[in-house]
Design a protein with these regions (language model features):
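Active-site-proximal loop/helix segment associated with metal-binding centers of metalloenzymes
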Residues: 122-176
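Short flexible/disordered coil segments
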Residues: 73, 100-116, 142-154, 175-176
Length: 176
């Protein structure tokens, strides 16, 4: 793992076009350009996307700008590491192989210069959050994923926009 190491979490890139979303993406891209100049390692610690569900032959075109920037970083030698969050758990080979260097579906840890690091997105860690932990088991189950993948991508993403908490609360901070 190369130094410096950067961490970014909960960006929640949206599929919708708005001035707020454009400003958020511009801010993210400035950060990614900075990381590119320093090389190193960049961890995306969950919820990079407000919703991401990859199909074997279909990727969401609304994230093209991010894919392009991330691919440029990877080609420039930046080690890109993606930890799946509760909004973007369902990645396949495009994100795992073409965009990122490493993908983690659970928490990860590493040691560096005698220090131990434990990296987690943090969803479902509250001891009393039984309902969410049950939901997490269901939506990450192979059966659920298989069933959801039967939906046409346009319909799947439309459903996701309806149930997204971030999409329904535009007053939440969107700064990167």
């Amino acid at each position: 793992m190369d130094l410096p190491i950067y961490f970014i979490s909960d960006v929640h890139l949206m599929q919708t076009e708005s001035s707020e979303e454009e400003a958020k993406r511009e801010s993210l891209y400035r950060f990614l350009n900075f990381v590119r100049t320093t090389r190193g390692t960049l961890f995306f610690v969950g919820d990079l996307f407000d919703f991401y569900f990859e199909y074997p032959d279909v990727i969401p075109k609304s994230y093209f700008g991010f894919y392009n920037k991330a691919f440029q970083l990877k080609k420039a030698g930046v080690d890109l590491r993606f930890i799946a969050g509760n909004h973007d758990y369902w990645v396949l080979d495009f994100m795992k192989e073409k965009i990122m260097n490493h993908t983690y579906f659970d928490d990860t840890s590493f040691s560096l210069r005698g220090k131990n690091f434990y990296i987690t997105h943090g969803d479902g860690v509250l001891s009393w959050d039984y309902g969410y932990r049950l939901l997490k088991k269901i939506i990450r189950s192979p059966f659920f994923i298989w069933c959801f993948r039967l939906l046409h991508p346009t319909l799947a993403y439309k459903i996701a926009r309806k149930v997204s908490r971030t999409e329904n609360h535009p007053e939440l901070p969107q700064e990167v």
